Amino acid sequence: MADKLIIFDTTLRDGEQSPGASMTKDEKLRIARQLERLRVDVIEAGFAASSNGDFEAVRAIADVIKESTVCSLARANDRDIARAAEALKSAARSRIHTFIATSELHMEKKLRMTREQVLEQARLSIRFARNLCEDIEFSPEDGYRSDPDFLCRVIEAVINEGATTINVPDTVGYGIPELYGNFIRTLRERVPNSDKAVWSVHCHNDLGMAVANSLAGVKIGGARQIECTINGLGERAGNCSLEEVVMAVRTRRDHFGLEVGIDTTQIVPASRLVSQTTGFIVQPNKAVVGANAFAHASGIHQDGVLKARDTYEIMRAEDVGWSANKIVLGKLSGRNAFKQRLQELGIELESETDVNAAFARFKDLADRKSDIFDEDIIALVGDESVTHEQETYRLLSLEQQSATGERPHAKVAFAVGETEFHAESEGNGPVDASLKAIESKLKSGAEMLLYSVNAITSGSTESQGEVTVRLQHGGRVVNGVGADPDIVVASAKAYLSALNKLHSKNERVAAQG
């Protein structure tokens, strides 16, 4: 029987460290439920000690997830570890993941600690954690750039104290596949008690090799856990992509000889949910989950695929969750048909009240758009009016006028709590005029870093526009997403969505692994 490869998803922790990718508790819950449907082995739900908001998110996820192990990150100190254990108290399966840097650069410049101090702190942190939880993971931060002799001492010590998983991060994405794989193998060969723990890899994508390095760590190094994120989400150039490593191991089972427990038909729904929630659009040519991943434009390729799919396809689109049934509903569709399609898409709303709210949004959209696609449904169930996210700012109505040769003008009505405001402004275009009207009353002081428009579905001018707005204020960066057939309305929704996140998100302590 083939060995099992453990899939450790850190979308909700390391992925969230992407500038603008911060998520609310309810958003994290929705993604965690999808990760469980995906049958991820371990869900790193957050960094419980970083903020009250993250603590509550980890605790809420621990309350509802029953099959996957729920994990919280913690620095190698008693306070962080105790906070993680408290947040995970209700979990059916829990793990504490603690870390401390071991490279000379990090120890000297960041920690200002000697080797012996780091070794002792690592040892004591694992000893303390084992009193609170049986499943303990240890990561030597910047492990790949650490001195191998010292790293072996640290790893041997923490395994002796009870660490059950040893994760060796390439924190800055410096590794090359052959070198990184051999590095993991050398550590496993030199650490006397290496067989007492599962070995894991965590690779960043700064040189574009996170997936290749992770697979080398498994094939050459003998690791049996990969840490990864949906869509490769993560700070800087991102993390190892879950969908890519899973499909690589599954498609090339002849080479890796490993099994993964992932339900691959849930990969595309997970990708869409993370993209819609964070506002990070998936590039069309992204492997496995990009819109063009199974598209064939060349006539020769098209002819070959029509005759035999395996001429140019090594995977089947439906195996990763792409549906051939695109047009699903219309304005005559009833509530039961809508609810059934939600289930088919893997969308789980918390109550019948939420289903009713989503159906009301669907009927409103169907009155304005003849064909409703899966992507439209995914966008509308993420709307704050459906999810009951805390809405300090809420769009009520928008009217805009523009004509050739005239300066566009917009009138906007919106609510701040229970107070209604009316504002109007001119601008360089209808979107600019609308957002200036909102700012004329709010005076938020936020700086816009990004404005982008993406067609939710292609091939028709009826398509909804999905707008992402990235704002920065007080050192925090957030994304807001809005969808509507009218891109001016979508823009106002996205802007207010971002302001809601700025208003509600707690300060965080950054963690890197």
UniProtKB/Swiss-Prot annotation:
Q: Which cofactor does it need?
A: Mn(2+)
Quote the subcellular location field of this record.
Cytoplasm
Report the catalytic activity.
Answer: 3-methyl-2-oxobutanoate + acetyl-CoA + H2O = (2S)-2-isopropylmalate + CoA + H(+)
Q: Report the main location listed first in the record.
A: cytoplasm
Give the EC number: 2.3.3.13
Q: Where is this region: Regulatory domain?
A: 394-513
In its keyword annotation, does this UniProt entry include Manganese?
A: yes
Q: Which residue ranges does the record assign to the Pyruvate carboxyltransferase domain?
A: 5-268
InterPro entries from the entry? 2-IPM_HCS-like (IPR050073), 2-isopropylmalate_synth_dimer (IPR013709), AIPM/Hcit_synth_CS (IPR002034), Aldolase_TIM (IPR013785), LeuA/HCS_post-cat (IPR054691), LeuA_allosteric_dom_sf (IPR036230), LeuA_bact_synth (IPR005671), PYR_CT (IPR000891)
* Domain of life assignment: Bacteria
Q: What is this protein called?
A: 2-isopropylmalate synthase
